[in-house]
Amino acid sequence: MVRFAAVTPRPLIAPHTVVGEHTHVLADGRVRCDVCPRACTMREGQAGFCFVREARGGEVVMTSYGRASGFCVDPIEKKPLNHFYPGSSVLSFGTAGCNLGCRFCQNWDISKAREFDRLTDAAMPEDIAAAAARAGCKSVAFTYNDPVIWGEYATDTAHAAHERGLSTVAVTAG
């Protein structure tokens, strides 16, 4: 198991908002989000296709940090993994928004949610890791929508989980 050094969660620049990674400023003043292959270009105040990344102050910010759309303790066998802690439990969670638009998505109500106020506010990375440990889970799963759009949140949650000896898995579209 890979061990990470203790990491302080990244600073919030506004409620549930952190500066995004993988951003480029374009010559015309727009910013480009390079988190996923869509490479959304945005002007100030515009949101990308995923709806959780937007242009603010000349950079892309992630607006769903610490806001999860659901939690569930699942058997690990429910995930697309092979022989990963067989018989164990995993704490699954996701956020709102998605970089895809699949009409057959079983999580459409979550992945295309625009009502952030219905999402929980009590879901900071350390809280998630602590909840997984209390529930007896061996791992935490980033799922329900493509976690690439909330990579900063997933990364910080992974650090918190690993500090507690928990593994992490990402269920992605790719």
Show the residue positions of the predicted features:
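Flexible, acidic/Gly-rich N-terminal and inter-domain linker regions that tether
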Residues: 1-88
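Conserved Radical SAM active-site core
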Residues: 55-174
